[in-house]
Amino acid sequence: MEGTLFNIWKGATRDGPGIRTVVALKGCPLRCIWCHSPESWSYAIEKYSNGETVGWKTTPEKIVEEVLRDKPFYDASGGGLTLTGGEPLAQAEFCAEILRLAKKAGLHTALETSGYAPLNVVESVEPFVDIWLYDVKLLDSENCLRHTGRPLKPVLENLRRLSAAKSRIVMRCPMIPGINDDEAELKARGALADELDSVEALDVLPYVPYGIDKAHRLGLKVYEAPQPPPEYGPLIAAKLSGLTSKPVCLAGNGKSVAERGVAAHGRICYNGGMGNVEERLCGLF
């Protein structure tokens, strides 16, 4: 069996617990206009305008072999393998086999997903996933279809199915100025997190314009907006923390500490009303 990747990052600390290797599978059914990885959209191996190749074919066995090279770091930090994309569930059998072999090898596994996949695909990988990093992009059905190109319904159905199965879930919240950061969206996110017992935390990911240059080099169009000011992320996270009982994390560099939070593994953590969440989140991330 072979599948297509477009990147591997080693030593990652923001994509699940501990030190991790992040493996990015190529191909995605969504077309989020703010996407920071437009090179992940196509399932095919491509070339940038400068001739640089994007993507390569490999096997699950070779991926797990490469990931295992850093196992001492995972063991020391509680880390492991994170699969991302694109949308990893779009290469369903390939994704499932990587995760199966990783678990067989004793690796902790995380899966970052948009949740846009058939239920049977989600169920096929569920036994091999230790924690789900579940991107909730928009909670207004009309806006979701407009800005991602796909309907919201299956995303929520799969999320609720995973929560009912008591899967560990971190709700990731990419926040895009003027698109999904209004009061109604934030309230909906907080309410959804409180509704689902298996959601352990919310992870705020402020917009960054990483995808613009890559899109231009591939002849694609994405949302072109400047990076929001440094205070944008903390303000969104602080607002969201007041709308949910769950902990809220803000992806950051750990250099500035918000008044109500502490830096933990590159994240600023906000108390969502659950007591000493700083200690809980240091264990989670």
Go through the PLM ranges and name each one:
Residues 1-59, 69-77, 268-273, 280-285:
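N-terminal [4Fe-4S]-dependent radical SAM core
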Residues 28, 39, 97-98, 218, ...:
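Generic secondary-structure boundary signal with a strong preference for alpha-helix termini
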Residues 48-53, 145-151, 218-226:
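Short glycine-enriched, charge-decorated loop/helix-capping segments at active-site entrances
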Residues 52-58, 117, 128, 136-137, ...:
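Short, exposed beta-strand "edge-strand" segments with a Pro/Gly-rich flavor and a Y/T-containing core
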Residues 64, 68-211, 216:
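Conserved AdoMet/S-adenosylmethionine-binding subsite of the radical SAM
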Residues 8, 25, 38, 60, ...:
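Fold-independent oxyanion-binding glycine-rich loops
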Residues 2-17, 177-285:
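Auxiliary Fe-S-binding modules of radical SAM enzymes
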